[in-house]
Each structure stands twice: as structure tokens, then as C-alpha cells.
């Protein structure tokens, strides 16, 4: 059980606003009011929420209103998050924390930051100018109202700005890193052709070029980016149809699940209004043979979803699309990085993008009297994670799915 190091707040004289029973004791400009809002109230709060996303310490496209509201509306009622928001003394929104309570029968006793099944991150949006105070106000609110042993901050970038702020807040609390891994990312600088050798995949780069030539012999190949709301609407339908034509048709294609298909249509359209989404396509004589949905926030991009025509597997259209996306991203400038949103050791993207970003799940205890319960909760959470990973490995061996 690890604890993040920090000088004791009482010794340093530093004070964070604390809310117990709704009492405001903070300075007017400090985060002082934490409250739970319904989905309807969050919808009405969309303009303030969008403004917060632009001021956020750590960007997260999956917690912006276009994505989060669409996801919450179209998931089963039992899986919908509770939205905890923090405001400062002037009423300005400084934090949005969607949470889900542990299952009373089979849960591990930890409140979780909401990670939708279609999301790759669960980093809360907090104002960069008062991030530690906002995080503390959230923890105090939960501690005063919930019986859970701790809060699980799931899927956040390791050593990212939010993670660093969390480290500064949790002195005196028990902390456990329940999971951590690295996934492929595209960092700025250099040329696309230089990435293969850096990844130790020089032969793979040569194979990509050979497959591109073979694809070009079949017809006119074009790479297109769709970013207006009208273009996104049409491209989303093409994506859903392309995805459903392949192996995902029997392993959970979005088009086969009406709620998820509606969610994707809604999220991409709403994000496009804020320049937060684009859909890229590789086309053969005008027909889409590979498509990717890319989310964007504060200079970061998220390669969220990819679909490709499996009848052209020998020409690897999915890899050709990622390679074209890589060139476009590196040539575009103003890039923080592109998150692959992939699993660790992904057999395709890892051979193209040599850089990695860390992602971690960090559990933080609530209350000094709950440490034993917190440790037990962490043990249960680890046991459940290991069981899920074992089940996934077994399923993948049985299915023997190929990646292209």
C-alpha cells in the first residue's frame, strides 16, 4: 500500500475548503460548493461544462459533454453515472466528477470515476487554476456522504497533470495503484517513415509500402478527412456499416446494438459542433475501405475507433489508414500527442508507433477509520481484475482473432 509523498497540510498551514453538511467555509474564489446533479441538470450546464473542458488541467475528450452526455443517455439506467460538480465561491464550475457506486452484492467497496465501455480514459475535468482544491472538495464531499472505503480514479495518464495534482492532495490518505500499463502513442516530431525503424519494425514498414502499391493497382486510393457536422453525420453511417460488415458483426458491432449506435451518432455529431471530432477514411474508387473516428481536445487526439473492409485483408487497409493518419498528424503541427486508445502490446499499432504513454488506476481511501476496509477493497478489486484478464486471454485464444 503506497502513499504519495507530501508535507502535512496542517504543518504547512495550507488549507483546502471543506464542505460538511453543506457548510461553506472557503474563500470566495476557492472551490467551495460540491453537489450532485441529475443528467437533466448536467444537460442544462453544458455551456459551463464546455468552458471547463477548455480550462481543464488534463484534457479528456471522453468527459466532455458531447461524449459523456450522449453515453449517459444511451446506457442502461443502472449503469448511468452520478455527476458530482464543484464550483468556486463565484459560482464558476471548477470540476466535473462522474461516479458510479460499487455493486452492493458483488462490488469491491470502491466508488469509481465512471469509465464508459466505449471510453479510453476517466480523468476528471478540473480547472487548471485550482485543481488541488477542486479535487480535495470532491473527496471531502464523497467522504461525508458515502460509506465506501475509497475512490478509484480509473484510466488516467500516469504522471499526467491530473495525476500530479492528485499526488499533492492525498497526503495522509492510503493510496494503492491497482493497475498500470503502457499503450502506443504518436508524439510530435520526425517523419512517419522514421517511426518503423524506431519501433524495430523496418520490415513491417517495407511490407506496408508493398501492400499500398498492391492496393493502388486495384483502383484510385484516396485519404479523406470529414470534420463538418454534415460530413460527420454521413461518415458515421458509413463507419457503422463498414464495422458491421466484418468480424464485429458477430462480436458486438455498434450497428447491432441500437443504443450504442445511437450513442455514436449523437456523440460524433455533438463533438463535431465544437471541433472535437473528425472521421478519416481510406477510399478505393470512392468506396470506404477503412475508417477511423478521431476525437480531439486541447491539442490531444484520440484514435478512438477503426473499421476496415475485411475482404481486402491482404492489402491491410486498416494499417494503411493508420499510416495515412500518422503522416497527416505529424504534418499538421500543434500536436501534443495522439493516444491510440489501444490495449497494451497491441499487435498492430505497436509496430507503427514506437512511443508509449502510461495509464493507471489509483485508489484513494476515504476517512482515517476506513483504512482496513480500503485495503480489503483493493484486494477484491485486484482479484476481480486478474479474473477478467484471465477470461479475456482465454476468449482471445478461442476466437483466434486476427488484426489488420
Q: What name fits each language-model region?
A:
Residues 119-121, 220, 359:
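Short, solvent-exposed beta-strand edge segments and adjacent coil->beta transition regions
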Residues 79-81, 146-150, 277, 333-338:
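Short, high-confidence coil segments that cap the C-terminus of an alpha-helix
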Residues 2-33, 164-194, 333-404:
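Active-site/acyl-donor-binding loops of N-acyltransferases
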Residues 116-147:
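A gly/proline- and charged-residue-enriched helix-loop-helix capping module
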Residues 88, 127, 133-140, 254-371:
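Aromatic (often tryptophan-rich) hydrophobic motifs at membrane interfaces
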Residues 139-141, 198-206, 376-384:
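Short intrinsically disordered coil segments
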Residues 143-161:
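ATP-hydrolysis module of ASCE/P-loop NTPase motor domains
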Residues 31-112, 155-183, 190-314:
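A conserved beta-strand-loop-helix scaffold within acyl/acetyltransferase catalytic domains
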